[in-house]
Regions:
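Short, surface-exposed loop/turn microsegments at beta-strand edges and helix-strand junctions
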Residues: 60-62, 73-75, 98-100, 221-228
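Alpha-helical interface subdomain recognition
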Residues: 1-3, 10-16, 83, 107-256
Length: 256
């Protein structure tokens, strides 16, 4: 989460870092062999300087996967909690230098956030295409609903948001390819992720209205509307909630 409480204390006698703490709602734990963890290594310091990053093999003694309640969507993502109890790490497992944890985190988060934005783009495009097909086939009062002005407004809004999101994702990808360490990467990644949430939310809501009751069935004959509607809700939270994205964007503007 955004509030970091896990700690790593240097044991001078043993020459190892000792990790204690918990991380909640971690994805893909069912197929991973390692994780990277941001810990407080110097509580006396303020701000980002107190944080460090570690590479943590998941077979280390003191590492525990904590089962989570079943989620309403993303059934195949393998979510779990991580618990560290006096987990010992040699110095080679420190990523970068001590005090660089936030730098490591933000660099990886920028890529992960755009992965989420790209996923939302794909989900939105799929829902849009399904909505167009259904609007052409669904007939009310003698004509397809795609001919009705209210439905046209929905379709236009969906297309507008999807096109804008695609431009944001491509813009980030271009900048990242040119220089992945430029000063605007974190800010642009947060913008893309945040806008992708607004996009997938609007598109999923409009899709459900276009499908009507048929879109609310688990086994709808017209496509996986219910599954997509549930799965895309997880995107609000992954790699930082909307409020965290706004803080990142504002901080980028302030720093520049």
């Amino acid at each position: 989460g955004a509030d970091l409480h896990s700690t790593a204390v240097w044991d001078e006698e043993k020459g190892k870092w000792i990790l204690n703490g918990e991380k909640w709602l971690i994805s893909h734990t069912d197929c991973s062999q390692f994780s990277y963890v941001i810990c407080v290594t110097d509580p006396d310091k303020k701000g980002d300087d107190r944080l460090s990053a570690f590479f943590v093999p998941m077979d280390k003694p003191g590492f525990e996967l904590v089962p989570m309640p079943h989620m309403m969507g993303c059934k195949g993502a393998g979510h779990a909690g991580l618990k560290f109890t006096n987990l010992k790490l040699d110095p080679i497992y420190l990523l970068g230098e001590e005090g660089q944890g936030m730098k490591v985190a933000m660099h990886s988060l920028a890529v992960s956030r755009v992965h989420i934005a790209t996923s939302n783009l794909g989900i939105s495009q799929r829902m849009f295409e399904m909505s167009i097909a259904r609007a052409r086939d669904r007939v009310t009062f003698g004509k397809p609903i795609i001919k009705r002005q209210a439905i046209k407004m929905k379709i236009a809004n969906m297309q507008m948001m999807i096109h804008a999101l695609r431009c944001l994702v491509y813009d980030f990808a271009q900048d990242f390819d040119i220089d992945q360490h430029n000063d605007y990467i974190d800010e642009k990644a947060a913008i893309a992720k945040l806008f992708s949430i607004d996009t997938v939310r609007l598109v999923s809501d409009e899709m459900l209205e276009i499908f009507g009751g048929d879109g609310y069935f688990e086994d709808s004959p017209y496509g996986p509307t219910e599954l997509l509607y549930r799965d895309c809700r997880a995107m609000w939270l992954e790699e930082g909630a909307p409020t965290v994205q706004r803080i990142t964007i504002a901080k980028g503007i302030e720093d520049h």
